[in-house]
């Protein structure tokens, strides 16, 4: 897997945070301590503010243009997507994966709303659209939405048939948090997700792509522009670590993060958000 880093600028929030400079320092620190890192990660910042029709909903022209700009980079690496309004960008990165794979999503929302406005890609329905249109996406693990929201989404998916419903493993915020104090709680939850794709080798697991929306986290770890959950970042990172350990040799494709709040002009708030991004970056590189 390539360990390069992409910062996607739609709202200007990353410039407000000074994220690129902070990540450069983080990379230098990790490289200095690493003993076997093949190459120093490259940080690329691309500006998309010239593309209209991207906020919350992504029209077909914008989707095509964004897709063209990210093709040269491939799906590998760590991608910063801006606010949760742009979480649909994950779908575009997934379209660059050219083999069967699995998607692990941490989000306070299901992001599986029925298409609206003529089926335009949206931040609220991108997972559903990816399941419907990406033949290589074999399985989705969704961690973090409230139980009630999950049950409502399951009903909506069931109305369209059992095929989509059968491709999703659900872990609600309530289930995730109620196991925190139990021994081996992460192993137990990961065990629910340990699914081998039908097209994968019987001895291996499908390659994995991970997407994190910071709105799964409590506001103490970063304020977003959406309603938020109560999960702690360390719990998310530990879950990922244990899940990967349960399938030795699994290919890790890449990861993305969204969930900034461009409207928060408080320097302290943006600093907390940036530090959360730095922590995720450090985890990714190690």
Region locations from a protein language model:
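Catalytic cores of soluble, metal-dependent hydrolases
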Residues: 2-81, 85-102, 125, 135-286
